């Protein structure tokens, strides 16, 4: 075995030299030099510095501007709340543990950090699923005479929380467990061991099927149908330049959404699956750390992609930041006029 398994931890290094120590009690500088942990702490500080303001601003602007409080925006707010969960409950803890070089908060702290990070990430993931389904239903109209209302929005939010809890809670009650991963400064699901009594294998398979493959399939289907519908609508109005421009904007937005989803989750999921299927094989601590911490950056680019690309929200945000005045009002007004003319296509943009 090329790693060292202990009570509630797994170190990706053999203890043949006697260097390995518990990540709850001792700095792990034998894994990575101190400067590596300092870089990790600086990265987490950057995510906190950007992630908290942009997500908090999203909530504040929506509360400040009544016209943004529509049912279609509920899931976008839910996305911001999920990102704040990750920032407050996960990033702050990881930054402090990185500064110390080990998980200073002990076993209980590992459970708390792992739970909040997993819960926030899963809420965000299932929020994207609900958003893609909402766009598909509203634009492609598979259900005739369907009107997306407040009750549907609340159900979507509740669904995302339920699915997130279905992934984050089991490790707290004995189905799998949270342990320090990578450089031992953040906690996640135990992909590394077949610890007796925790049924890690069944939980990891359940998580990959239900909480990765299913969301990926749903988002791919919904956005694929969305692009086709946009192209069909534009083809029927080829004389309208504004419609063609709206088609390009919407298509670009959808592609960015999908690529961001893949960039966030595929590297982490791929590495986790490799570790799970090659337990005991040799891999370095950075091997899991890089994709795990890259996935955390979703708390920053999620609101940028899903909210700041919304022209109405961007207008309200600029108005709020500029004390009630929008210096770009004329440009926003012309864009709004274009959106009105190309109504059949522009309904694809988040409301």
Curated annotation (Swiss-Prot):
Residues 330-351 are annotated as: Disordered. One of its GO terms (biological process) is G protein-coupled opsin signaling pathway. The keyword Ribosomal protein does not apply. Its main location: membrane. It is a multi-pass membrane protein. Glycans are attached at residues 2, 15, 200. The record marks 113 as: Plays an important role in the conformation switch to the active conformation. CDD domains: 7tmA_MWS_opsin (cd15080). The keyword Disulfide bond applies. GO terms for cellular component: membrane; photoreceptor disc membrane; plasma membrane. This is Rhodopsin. The gene is rho.
């Amino acid at each position: 075995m090329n790693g060292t398994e202990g009570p509630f931890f797994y170190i990706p290094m053999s203890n043949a030299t006697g260097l390995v120590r518990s990540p709850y009690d001792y700095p792990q500088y034998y894994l990575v030099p101190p400067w590596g942990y300092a870089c990790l702490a600086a990265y987490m500080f950057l995510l906190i510095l950007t992630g908290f303001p942009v997500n908090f601003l999203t909530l504040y602007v929506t509360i400040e501007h009544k016209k943004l409080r529509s049912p279609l925006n509920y899931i976008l707010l839910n996305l911001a709340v999920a990102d704040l969960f990750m920032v407050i409950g996960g990033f702050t803890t990881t930054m402090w543990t990185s500064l110390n070089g080990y998980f200073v908060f002990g076993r209980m702290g590992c459970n708390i950090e792992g739970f909040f990070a997993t819960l926030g990430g899963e809420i965000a993931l299932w929020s994207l699923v609900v958003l893609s389904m909402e766009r598909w239903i509203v634009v492609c109209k598979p259900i005739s005479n369907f009107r997306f209302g407040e009750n549907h929005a609340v159900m979507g939010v509740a669904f995302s929380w339920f699915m997130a809890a279905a992934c984050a809670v089991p490790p707290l009650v004995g189905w799998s467990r949270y342990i320090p991963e990578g450089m031992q400064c953040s906690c996640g699901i135990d992909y590394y061991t077949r610890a007796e009594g925790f049924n890690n294998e069944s939980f990891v398979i359940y998580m990959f099927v239900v909480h990765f493959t299913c969301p990926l399939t749903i988002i791919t289907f919904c956005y694929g149908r969305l692009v086709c519908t946009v192209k069909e609508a534009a083809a029927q109005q080829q004389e309208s330049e504004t419609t063609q421009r709206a088609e390009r904007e919407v298509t670009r937005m959808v592609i960015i959404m999908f690529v961001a989803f893949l960039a966030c989750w595929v590297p982490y999921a791929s590495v986790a699956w490799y570790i799970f299927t090659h337990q005991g094989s040799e891999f370095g601590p950075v091997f899991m750390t890089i994709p795990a911490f890259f996935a955390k950056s979703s708390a920053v680019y999620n609101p940028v992609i899903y909210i700041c690309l919304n022209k109405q929200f961007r207008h309200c945000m600029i108005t709020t930041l500029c004390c009630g005045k929008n210096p770009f009002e004329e440009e926003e007004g012309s864009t709004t006029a274009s959106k009105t003319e190309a109504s059949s296509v522009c309904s694809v943009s988040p409301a």
